[in-house]
Structures are given as structure tokens and as C-alpha cells.
């Protein structure tokens, strides 16, 4: 079968790779001049398979009020827009801020995340996929507030494989935290989690795909229209050319919303803007070897070979991916206070990207309402973590096979 995939970030590339592995011909379409130049370019790097709790949770609305008073220092910032889409998304987000809803969605995400880890392992072992700074280094979520620690501990279940640590044990796991020991209340450790460079992963997938005669890449081309006949998409229009297809996968991140609106498909996806720094290492002893998430400041740290990736923040503020220097300054200050001397944060490479998120925090994988149009969108901050599993499940369904794990709670409602 001939399958077109729109979007060449980590979700689209993983989908294309899985489809080609399963014997399909793939046309991968990307509006930028190269792959993985947007949300997949400089994200947090953590493959957080066991710590997958959605942003929407009990207590977040009240916290958000306090955060809004902090301005550029706030982990989450809301800037109202004259947009019905934004306000509707925010209302759905508030409705999802219940503990029961959070736990249910976290279970769906954990199921998908653990499958995604298995698929990446199989690709690495069976295909010798490497060259993207992958390590199995574990993840440590540190807490500076006792109430937050108790809340996090209550969410640990047997399947997650997580362990509750006191402050001294946190330092044992990650000695680079020694200067912070007095301010820590404890942590949650996930020894099975991993790290990798998402952009390098994408370029390696592309290199493998280009070796296949079943793969064709279209870059620098925007989709002009989708030609439909009844409940089927017959072709993707690129400029003056029609690309005839048997199936279409939309994996265009936040761009999926506008792309599908003319077909009457209203995706509940909104961009959550995040920021990152990529820092050249200066002092190896001050750089964390383990993935570290500072829960109270909402900052993640991941070592990628000879660099430290620092990522943070959620701006619910529209579709502009430009850098906000006040937010960058906050990130530099927090990183300097947490891992001083690890590198020169003032000279770090700065980046901002738009995470395509649903209000509930769960992605939309599978059917769209059209017979041959499929979705793989809405992964939020977990796109890299969930990419391989999402790709495997969707390519199985497209090929007529049952998915390896249930897509319950991970699809567009009928």
C-alpha cells in the first residue's frame, strides 16, 4: 500500500519507519527544508517511560493562579488570545483537572510508554539503530516541597517500577546534586528510563529510510489541499501536483489543526510552548549522569554526550514559536542554581518549540472519521517518549492487524 505521512518530526519519521519496516511504500511530506526542525529539534531529551502523569491534575488550576502572579518566572504562563479554540481547550483542560481523570489518563500513557520502550529496544537490537546519544541512565524526580513529594509518592504503582527516595538517597543516585542536598525533601527514581538526542534520532531514521526504495521524501512543500471523495482521501495536493495515496497519516503536530479543519475534523490540540538550553560541558563532576527533573521548578536536565540539555516551562499563549528572552533568563538562572559550574549557561544554544497537546494529555492515534485518514498527533511533552510505540500501533492498524496494546483512551472520540 502507498501511505502518505504529513509531518517529518519524530512522530512522522517514526511512523514512516515503522510502515516501511512492515512492507508499505511511504511518501513523507514536510513543509520545512529538512526534517525535525521544530518541536523535535531541541526538546528535553528524556525518554520518560514511567513518569508520564498528564499536566492536567487536581490542584493545578489553583497553582496556576499563583504561577500567573510570578510573571516570567512561572512554570506555566497563560496569555489570553482572541481565540475560541484557545478558550475551549482551556475549558476542557480544567475539566480534566481531577485526580480520577489524571490517574486514568496516566494509566493509558504508561501502557503506551512501556510499549514504546519495547519498540525502540527492538529497533536498536534488530536494525542496529544507533548514533543518537542513547543511554539507559534512569530518571530522578527531585522534590523541594514535602507536600509535592507526598503527592508524587501516592501516584507510584507496582507497574511503574519507581522507587521513593529520601534526600540522602537522591544524592547517592546522582552525586551532582550534592550542593542541593539540604534543600531536597526526597525524590522518585525510575531506574529503567533512558535518554537520547531526539534530533539525531530523527536524522538517523531518515538515513535508514533513504536506503529503502519504498520511501520518498518531499521537503520544502506545504500541503495545499486534501482531495476527498466521500469519506476517503484520494490525494494530497502539493503545489500543482497530486500525490495519489491509499492511506494518509497526519502527524504534523500543531499544524494538524488547520490542515484537517476544512474536512470538518476539529482536533482538540493547542500548542504548549516550551524552552530549552543546550550547554557545552565544563566540569564533568557537576553534570548529572542521571536524567533529573526538578518537580517544583518544572525543569528537566539530560546529559547528551558532551552537552547538557535543560528544558522547561509551559506557555499557553498562541502559535508563535519565537524566543522570549525573559523566559530564557529564568531558565539560565534556575539551571545555574541547580547545577552550578556544569557549563556556561549564558553561552548556551537557546531554543523554543510548540508542543502539540490535548487537554487530557493523551495523544490521538488511529481513526479520524475518514476511512483512510489516520491520526498520530497530540503527544505534548512526551512526543519522543511515545513516538516508537505510537508508530508501531498505528502501522499495525493500517496494515489490518490488531495493535499490540489497546488504543483505549488514546484515540479521537467517535
What are the residue ranges of the model-derived segments?
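Glycine-rich FAD pyrophosphate-binding loop
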Residues: 21-41
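Rossmann-like flavin
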Residues: 87-204
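Helical element adjacent to the flavin cofactor pocket in flavoenzyme catalytic cores
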Residues: 153-154, 180-242
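Active-site substrate-recognition segment that forms the wall
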Residues: 43-46, 51, 55-95, 225-228, ...
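N-terminal Rossmann-like FAD-binding beta1-loop-alpha1 element of flavoenzymes
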Residues: 2-28
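C-terminal catalytic lobe of FAD-dependent flavoproteins
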Residues: 192, 295-296, 336-414
Amino acid at each position: 500500500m502507498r501511505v502518505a505521512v504529513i509531518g517529518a518530526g519524530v512522530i512522522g519519521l517514526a511512523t514512516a519507519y515503522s510502515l516501511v519496516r512492515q512492507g508499505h511504500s511511504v511518501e513523507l511530506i514536510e513543509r520545512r527544508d529538512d526534517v525535525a526542525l521544530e518541536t523535535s529539534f531541541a526538546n528535553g531529551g528524556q525518554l520518560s517511560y514511567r513518569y508520564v502523569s498528564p499536566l492536567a491534575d487536581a490542584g493545578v488550576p489553583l497553582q496556576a493562579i499563583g504561577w500567573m502572579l510570578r510573571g516570567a518566572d512561572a512554570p506555566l504562563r497563560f496569555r489570553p488570545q482572541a481565540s475560541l479554540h484557545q478558550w475551549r481547550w482551556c475549558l476542557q483542560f480544567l475539566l480534566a483537572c481531577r485526580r480520577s481523570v489524571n490517574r486514568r489518563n496516566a494509566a493509558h500513557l504508561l501502557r503506551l510508554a512501556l510499549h514504546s520502550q519495547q519498540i525502540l529496544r527492538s529497533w536498536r537490537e534488530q536494525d542496529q539503530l544507533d548514533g543518537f546519544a542513547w543511554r539507559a541512565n534512569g530518571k530522578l524526580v527531585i522534590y523541594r516541597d514535602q507536600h509535592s513529594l507526598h503527592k508524587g509518592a501516592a501516584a507510584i504503582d507496582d507497574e511503574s517500577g519507581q522507587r521513593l527516595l529520601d534526600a540522602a538517597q537522591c544524592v547517592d543516585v546522582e552525586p551532582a546534586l550534592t550542593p542541593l542536598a539540604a534543600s531536597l525533601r526526597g525524590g522518585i527514581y525510575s531506574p529503567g528510563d533512558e535518554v537520547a538526542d531526539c534530533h539525531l534520532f530523527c536524522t538517523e531514521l531518515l538515513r535508514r529510510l533513504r536506503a529503502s526504495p519504498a520511501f520518498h521524501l518531499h521537503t520544502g512543500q506545504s500541503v495545499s489541499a486534501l482531495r476527498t471523495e466521500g469519506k476517503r482521501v484520494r490525494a494530497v495536493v502539493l503545489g500543482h501536483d497530486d500525490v495519489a495515496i491509499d492511506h494518509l497519516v497526519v502527524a504534523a503536530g500543531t499544524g494538524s489543526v488547520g490542515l484537517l479543519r476544512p474536512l470538518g475534523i476539529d482536533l482538540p490540540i493547542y500548542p504548549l510552548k516550551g524552552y530549552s538550553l543546550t550547554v557545552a560541558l565544563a566540569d564533568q563532576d557537576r553534570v548529572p549522569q542521571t536524567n533529573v527533573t526538578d518537580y517544583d521548578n518544572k525543569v528537566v536536565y539530560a546529559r547528551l554526550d558532551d552537552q547538557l540539555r535543560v528544558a522547561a516551562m509551559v506557555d499557553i499563549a498562541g502559535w508563535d514559536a519565537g524566543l522570549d528572552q525573559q523566559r530564557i533568563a529564568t531558565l539560565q538562572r534556575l539551571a545555574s542554581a541547580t547545577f552550578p559550574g556544569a557549563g556556561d549557561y549564558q553561552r548556551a544554544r537557546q531554543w523554543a518549540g510548540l508542543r502539540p497537546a490535548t487537554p487530557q494529555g493523551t495523544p490521538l492515534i488511529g481513526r479520524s472519521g475518514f476511512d483512510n485518514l489516520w491520526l498520530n498527533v497530540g503527544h505534548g511533552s512526551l512526543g519522543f517518549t511515545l513516538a516508537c510505540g505510537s508508530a508501531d500501533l498505528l502501522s499495525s492498524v493500517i496494515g489490518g492487524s490488531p495493535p499490540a496494546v489497546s488504543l483505549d483512551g488514546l484515540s479521537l472520540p467517535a
